[in-house]
Design a protein with these regions (language model features):
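Non-catalytic cap/lid and distal C-terminal segments of serine-dependent acyl enzymes
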Residues: 1-253
């Protein structure tokens, strides 16, 4: 079942739309359903996963719910211009959905987060910022290092999202936006991190940073699955590997 929600968000201060896939049947014993909070990329919106992939079919096979918000071009940040997209996708939206759908639970084991490209970054950021909220995480072609100088995005977009005084992405190193720093911090504090599935294509310009993040997680002893294979930065491969990620984390279907 596909539902389209439209509501006024306090965090992003405007009307927003969210697509929600619900299992066709509820558990007769009242067991909550597993929910995948699924994020789009820089050039996408809440409709992207529905339009470009078979996510509805894959959700049905795994008997899970999927929630797909619209995060604009925010890089899933609480932005400098006042739209708190990170708080929206990690706090406000889950709370709203749990009030709306009785089968949703805040318990960690019922929640996964995933995304592609910018959304892969957002998903890993959510998993590392709130590891107590998510049992697992999926990143496909994730733009996992936002501190690089050679960003494809212009600096003005960076400033509007991360700080108007920002002169270089390098200034974000070591902050709450830096996934490498977040991973190290969590491990130093002994926190249990979500099991993570990472995929990137061999023809993708983001391959080196994905390899570096995999190497970091390996050195830290973080439970994760890393795969790289033929593919570029396109939906053909994201559609294929969202299936791989779900099968890895939830079991083959």
């Amino acid at each position: 079942m596909l539902l389209k929600l439209s509501f006024q968000s306090k965090e992003i201060k405007k009307m927003t739309q969210v697509n929600v896939i619900l299992p066709d049947e509820t558990d007769p014993a009242g067991e909550p359903c597993t929910v995948l909070w699924l994020f789009h990329g820089l050039h996408g919106d809440h409709n992207s996963w529905m339009q470009e992939s078979g996510i509805k079919k894959y959700a049905k096979a795994h008997r899970i719910a999927v929630v797909m918000p619209d995060a604009d071009r925010s890089w899933y940040a609480d932005t400098a211009y006042g739209a708190n997209y990170f708080s929206f996708v990690t706090k406000e939206l889950p709370e709203l959905c749990r009030k709306t759908f009785s089968s949703f639970s805040a318990e960690r084991k019922y929640n996964l987060v995933g995304g592609l490209s910018m959304g892969g970054y957002g998903a890993v950021k959510a998993a590392l910022t709130y590891p107590e909220q998510y049992a697992a995480c999926i990143s496909l072609s994730g733009s996992l290092d936002i501190t690089r100088k050679n960003r494809a995005c212009d600096l003005e977009l960076w400033k509007s999202n991360f700080g108007f005084d920002l002169q270089s992405p390098l200034e974000l190193e070591g902050t709450a936006h830096d996934l490498f720093a977040l991973a190290r911090k969590n491990c130093e504090e002994g926190k249990a991190l979500p099991k993570t599935y990472i995929w990137c294509g061999l023809e993708d310009s983001l391959l080196p940073v994905n390899q570096e993040f995999h190497q970091l997680l390996t050195s830290l002893g973080v439970d994760h699955t890393y795969e790289e294979s033929t593919g570029n930065h396109s939906w053909k491969w994201w559609d294929l590997h969202i299936q791989s990620g779900l099968n890895c984390l939830l079991g083959e279907k």
